[in-house]
Amino acid sequence: MTRFARIALIILLYFGALSAIGGGILGTVDNGGGVPLEYLRSTPFTSYLIPSLILGIVIGGTQGAAAILLHRRNAYSSGAATVAGFGMMIWIFVELAIIGYDVLQTLYFGLGALEVLLVLGLMGALGPAVKTSPTQSVTRRQRHR
């Protein structure tokens, strides 16, 4: 599970980074990239410049930084990936509150949630990989020696 979770998390983080940075660039260059300006009516924004910069720099940046740290096996990679996953979910919550529902939001919220679940898997917080009883203290490594 650990090797699979690590590789899957790296792939998801790179995907999230590229997607958010690409969306940020498109939104900055094309003022929302085709998203109607009327979605911003109830916000303090008059254009998509600031939201696009936040998407590209903050969301894309944390996703990319977490992917790089995890790829390099840095000690802070789990924390960075957790921040990136929750950041993605918070971004989607804010989007839902401001502009309403779109199918892509389900995908990206799921991406953030899956990132957090994979971090929990890497940390062993989802339970032991091998079923044990209170009297059994043999770990997986000891059993395979």
Where are the predicted features?
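Topology signature of small-to-medium multi-pass alpha-helical membrane proteins
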Residues: 1-145
